[in-house]
Amino acid sequence: METTTTTLGGGGGGRAGGFSDPPSPLSPPLSPASAAAAALANARWTPTKEQIAVLEGLYRQGLRTPTAEQIQQITARLREHGHIEGKNVFYWFQNHKARQRQKQKQQSFDYFSKLFRRPPPLPVLHRPLARPFPLAMAPTAMPPPPPPPATTTTAACNAGGVMFRTPSFMPVATNNASYYPQQQTPLLYPGMEVCPHDKSTAQPPATTTMYLQAPPSSAHLAAAAGRGAAEAEGHGRRGGGAGGRETLQLFPLQPTFVLPDHKPLRAGSACAAVSPTTPSASASFSWESESSDSPSSEAPPFYDFFGVHSGGR
């Protein structure tokens, strides 16, 4: 069985053995006034309403970080409304600035959050129902339209309207106008006119000039009527009148042409003259009897249409 022996040595051995140093002597006790002052200094500051109102008024005036001299002046002023220290004034300004910055940041964050989350609705303007103009200023009737110029004549349909338009016409072409196209109209031949060969006359065709003219008026109608009458009279002269026309049979059984007395022709000869320049074609045919010993030249010639005398060829 082993025994443990403890060796007592100097101060170093006592610390090593677990013994502590002797306690230091206590500070002298405080007086009751000093103890009360220390308790007030360590106590939490509770500002009164008057002190808060004075400090907020200084902050609104632009005071943010007061100097040491300003802190002393403010502390002396606030002590009239309750207990306060200089450090309380300094910390109040620091905390109030931080709270204001935090409040502004929160307001900005809330504003942009609402803006991005859902746009605000468009404002609706509520207007009371009212007339476009007062009753005293309301016109009783529409003003009359301005009168047209004295030199122009307006259409009858625009007499009571608000728009007046002057009639315009194309200029009337002159006889020697070079910029109007001239062309010949085709001549129609309604029927074949038969007349003796010696009475056929060759006349130049009548050309018709077409112009772009203005709308018909009394002067233009009169001129057109005069031209139509002149042309009808000219055609009557050239055609020899309605009494000189004959209607030929499609398959005649007897000779239809008569030889002229003063102009003998050979047997079997045919003379057909058609004038292409006249508006109506004239044709004359003359036939002589096949037998040269005809007793009389006055007898009508005979023409074998069906080839009886020639053997049916």
From Swiss-Prot:
Keyword vocabulary terms for this entry: Developmental protein, DNA-binding, Homeobox, Nucleus, Transcription, Transcription regulation
Annotated organism of origin: Oryza sativa subsp. indica (Rice)
GO cellular component, one term: nucleus
Name the record gives this protein: WUSCHEL-related homeobox 5
Primary localization: nucleus
UniProt xrefs under PANTHER family: WUSCHEL-RELATED HOMEOBOX 1-RELATED, WUSCHEL-RELATED HOMEOBOX 2
CDD domains tied to this protein: homeodomain (cd00086)
Record InterPro entries: HD, Homeodomain-like_sf, WUSCHEL-like
Biased composition range(s): Low complexity: 271-301
Subcellular location: Nucleus
Chain's gene name: WOX5
Role of this protein: Transcription factor which may be involved in developmental processes.
DNA-binding region extent: 40-104
Bias kind Pro residues: ranges: 22-31
Family: Belongs to the WUS homeobox family.
GO molecular function, one term: DNA-binding transcription factor activity
Annotated stretches, region: Disordered: 1-32, 224-247, 271-313
